[in-house]
């Protein structure tokens, strides 16, 4: 019974050795390779006659990570006993001459004959995922900081600068009525007009930065305010349809929806050459979907209008931060549909 179990274990180990993606190499005490599985041949090929080369692994190794350096040959793992039976990161050159990171283990398995096993697992995909997660985390922090600063400046403009200017306007009107001088009255009238225009411009800038209604009342209120201002400033009619009414969502989701729609509307204004844009926001309780539709010029996704590329890329980046997705459907002379969907 024991023999049968041993044979079964031997067969299992043999199957693992032959089929695993883990690269397994056996070397003697001189550093000559005496055996390796097929997976290891991505790095060490039989044509190179590595079984006759002393310290064969060194010829493909680009260093390992230690406590001092990311890539180093100092205190080589082939010579030190400190790394025995422990995992470490090593950089190996593949047969295609690409340098890739691996999680490695180098351990003596037969002291009497001086045989050691060197195993490698490719960690490039994990590192790429970690880098992407880190980039997304940094992007999230950057956008959050940007939105917070927009909010601060917007409120400062609305609560402080505009109020001060309104006070100046009141003082100017009082001055005009106190002194009945014709020239003074005409000058005051002109200054009032300039001041009124400046107040409107600052109000618009405040809303562009970040409307207070987005934080206080939600998406629908923010859009109604923004679209009204947009129509007054640019003469572009926006047809808005929504079923979200007073519904509130996570602050980050509301910000993404607002910014993506804002970018889509502004792109349509600049490039579509239309008089009307259709915007819709709907939710079924499981997701929120926003659409920006124009019946204008359209464009090729491979050759989008100059200046719009960063905006389209920014839409997708923002959407990814809340596990959302942006789809752009466009046809020359038929228009563009930008669809954002976010799970909630």
Curated annotation (Swiss-Prot):
Residues engaged in binding [4Fe-4S] cluster: 58, 61, 73, 76
Keywords attached to this entry: 4Fe-4S, ATP-binding, Cytoplasm, Iron, Iron-sulfur, Kinase, Metal-binding, Nucleotide-binding, Phosphoprotein, Transferase, Two-component regulatory system
Cofactor: how and how many bound: Binds 1 [4Fe-4S] cluster.
Compartment(s): Cytoplasm
Catalyzed reaction equations: ATP + protein L-histidine = ADP + protein N-phospho-L-histidine
Modification note: Autophosphorylated.
Pfam family, one: HisKA_3
Domain Histidine kinase: 147-344
Domain of life: Bacteria
SUPFAM superfamilies the record matches: ATPase domain of HSP90 chaperone/DNA topoisomerase II/histidine kinase
Any coiled-coil regions, as ranges: none
Molecular-function GO terms, alphabetical: 4 iron, 4 sulfur cluster binding; ATP binding; iron ion binding; phosphorelay sensor kinase activity; protein dimerization activity
Cofactor: [4Fe-4S] cluster
Cellular component, GO annotation: cytoplasm; membrane
Modified residues (Phosphohistidine): 158
Protein role: Member of the two-component regulatory system NreB/NreC involved in the control of dissimilatory nitrate/nitrite reduction in response to oxygen. NreB functions as a direct oxygen sensor histidine kinase which is autophosphorylated, in the absence of oxygen, probably at the conserved histidine residue, and transfers its phosphate group probably to a conserved aspartate residue of NreC. NreB/NreC activates the expression of the nitrate (narGHJI) and nitrite (nir) reductase operons, as well as the putative nitrate transporter gene narT.
Name of the protein in its database record: Oxygen sensor histidine kinase NreB
């Amino acid at each position: 019974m024991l023999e049968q179990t041993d044979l079964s274990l031997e067969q299992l180990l043999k199957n693992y050795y032959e089929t695993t993606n883990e690269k397994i190499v056996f070397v003697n005490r001189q550093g000559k390779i005496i055996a390796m599985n097929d997976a290891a041949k991505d790095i060490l090929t039989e044509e190179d006659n590595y079984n006759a080369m002393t310290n064969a692994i060194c010829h493909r190794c680009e260093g390992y990570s230690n406590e001092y350096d990311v890539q180093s040959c100092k205190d080589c793992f082939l010579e030190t006993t400190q790394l025995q039976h422990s995992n470490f990161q090593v950089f190996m050159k593949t047969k295609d001459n690409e340098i890739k990171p691996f999680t490695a283990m180098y351990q003596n398995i037969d002291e009497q004959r001086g045989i050691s096993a060197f195993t490698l697992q490719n960690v490039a995909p994990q590192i790429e995922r970690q880098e992407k997660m880190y980039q997304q985390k940094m992007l999230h922090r950057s956008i959050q900081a940007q939105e917070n600063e927009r909010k601060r400046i917007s409120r400062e403009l609305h609560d402080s600068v505009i109020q001060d200017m309104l006070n100046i306007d009141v003082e100017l009107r009082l001055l005009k009525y106190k002194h009945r001088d014709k020239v003074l009255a005409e000058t005051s009238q002109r200054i009032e007009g300039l001041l009124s225009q400046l107040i409107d411009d600052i109000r618009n800038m405040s809303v562009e930065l970040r409307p207070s209604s987005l934080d206080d009342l939600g998406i629908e209120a923010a859009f109604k305010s923004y679209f009204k201002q947009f129509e007054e400033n640019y003469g572009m009619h926006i047809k808005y349809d929504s079923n979200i009414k007073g519904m509130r969502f996570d602050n980050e989701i509301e910000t993404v929806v607002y910014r993506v729609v804002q970018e889509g509307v502004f792109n349509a204004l600049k490039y579509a050459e239309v008089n009307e844009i259709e915007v819709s926001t709907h939710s079924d309780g499981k997701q929120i979907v926003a659409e920006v539709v124009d019946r204008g010029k359209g464009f090729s996704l491979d050759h989008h209008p100059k200046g719009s590329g960063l905006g389209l890329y920014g839409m997708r980046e923002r959407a990814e931060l809340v596990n959302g997705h942006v789809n752009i459907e466009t046809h020359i002379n038929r228009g563009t549909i930008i669809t954002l969907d976010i799970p909630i």
